[in-house]
Amino acid sequence: MKDILPEEMQIRDYVQQVIKETYRSFGFTPIETPCMENIANLSSKQGGENEKLIFKVMKRGEKLKIDEAKSESDLVDFGMRYDLTVPLVRFYSNNANDLPSPFKALQMGSVWRADRPQRGRYRQFMQCDIDIIGEPSNLAEIELILATTTTIGKLGFKNFEIRINERRILKAMAAYSGFAEEDFDTVFIILDKMDKIGADGVAKELEEEGYAKESVEKYMALFEGVKNADNGLKYLARTLEGYLEEEVEKNLLEIIDSVEAAKTASFEMVFDPTLVRGMSYYTGTIFEISMPELGAACGGGGRYDKMVGRFTGQDVPACGFSIGFERIILLLMESGFTVPMQRPKVAYLVEKGYPTDKLGEVIKQAQQERTAGKQVLVVRMNKNKKFQKEKLTAEGYK
């Protein structure tokens, strides 16, 4: 958690404005949910590793009976949201009758995770999500990717990648290699480390986990085959015949081709069979923004068709994309980014002992300029007026 100084706040406000305006142009509607959710909603085995990072809120008043508590559930009833997806699903379930279908939601707000702080990652951070609920076709993925990449492009980023994969491909690869279905999650957790430990490291960890060497070798050979193939997706579709539904290849190719044909930003769509995404609620397509400047993901998302049904008892197709807002801000700050001048900025420096009647004239003039659309600052003149003027000039004031 950190304090935000004026210089950074100005950039954050600008970025939020660009995000909101762009997403609204794609038909997304802003909504807001509380920062706290019922602990049962947050700890339902849908949030993956994030469920271990919940800031939990103790019961209060008469409900808090410490002496009688036998487990954590007797002490805790709420938690700070760790993402915006779980609250959105609860929101949709409660208000579905009053919402259009499909529903295109835009959310921007703080989330909290009791994580180890690192570069571009904090315990309290802003998330910017767009989701489409009620659209079963891949039109949802296409719209989400185009809206997000258009936004990233407007912020000045180029030559980034959208890595894309499918949960059904991950499962088919594991089944083809001989892993039992109950072991898939463990296999995927290890595979998710590929960027950090490499193929040899993944193979070693799988063997250390006790899996058969034959299965591990067969599994790793698939990734080598993708690497050497002219078209990795088509290679897997052929190799995994009988394990992978035919529609999966067609679905991904439609998404990739449609986005490539319509994109306005400078980026590439890349099929990546090592992409896992940590959330267990994903059911189909998954995708991630890869920034060369950061050397890490800068946002991601995917399809979660089974999650709404956990609240309503009836599955509703859903898909979402989240921008890594804090990492975007970090990159802009480090690059020396300055907010484009949106309106003129004028500063009036008032000397000590300035006559009251003349001060009134200055205030009146300032008000007139504000009415005309200018940003006007009225401040007392410092002793070191040269330094003061230099600082104001650096901030864009005239």
Which residues does each predicted region cover?
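Auxiliary tRNA-acceptor-end handling modules of aminoacyl-tRNA synthetases
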Residues: 1-12, 66
